[in-house]
């Protein structure tokens, strides 16, 4: 038997700390939306050390499902190999009451099945990571290369220019711009430094 806990969300953005108390429960949160709004819904559970494997769905004013997510792979959470948390983006099609439904994938529940829900406007952003995180440039060797990976958040599609920040004299690279569909850039670094040069940041 499924039971429901329903709550009206008065204003957005909102963060809700909740719990699936009993097996088979669904928590439902209702909010008023406007046509054309770009919204993000995110459920954190495993990242908070909860045993919950969340499942998320969003229904519109007519009750039809508009978005669904079980497992969302978060590239920024490298230590987690089981991406069990949920995330969905949605452009609202019309004015009216929308509902966010949350449960456990295998319908588990209990005191330890806590979660954190975020409902907010999309906040496009990005984070960069380099591989390797450090590099040895041998004197007079001509340089080396690094790969720069971008993690885009909340629908970010802006072009991202990538280059070295304030390199010392004798070190240079040609800037590269990541388009909205690219996730990695390779920087070729030229080096013309003496062998006695100490370590420095790029």
Language model regions located:
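Acidic, Ser/Thr/Pro-rich low-complexity intrinsically disordered segments
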Residues: 9-114, 118-173, 201-202
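Low-complexity "stalk/linker" and mucin-like segments enriched in Ser/Thr/Pro/Ala/Gly
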Residues: 168-184
């Amino acid at each position: 038997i499924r039971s429901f806990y329903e709550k009206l969300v008065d204003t957005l953005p909102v963060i809700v700390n909740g719990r699936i108390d009993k097996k088979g429960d669904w928590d439902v949160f209702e909010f008023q939306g406007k046509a054309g709004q770009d919204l993000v819904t995110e459920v954190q559970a495993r990242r908070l050390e909860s045993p919950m494997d969340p499942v998320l769905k969003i229904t519109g004013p007519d009750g039809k499902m508009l978005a669904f997510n079980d497992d969302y792979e978060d590239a920024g959470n490298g230590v987690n190999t089981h991406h069990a948390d949920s995330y969905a983006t949605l452009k609202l099609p019309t004015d009216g009451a929308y509902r966010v439904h949350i449960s456990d994938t295998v319908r588990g529940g209990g005191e330890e099945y806590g979660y954190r829900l975020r409902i907010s406007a999309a906040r496009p952003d990005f984070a960069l990571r380099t591989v390797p995180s450090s590099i040895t440039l041998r004197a007079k060797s001509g340089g080396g290369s690094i790969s720069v990976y971008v993690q885009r958040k909340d629908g970010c599609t802006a072009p991202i220019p990538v280059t070295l920040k304030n390199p010392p004299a004798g070190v240079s690279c040609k800037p590269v711009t990541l388009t909205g569909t690219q996730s990695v850039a390779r920087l070729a670094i030229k080096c013309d430094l003496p062998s006695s040069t100490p370590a420095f940041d790029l």
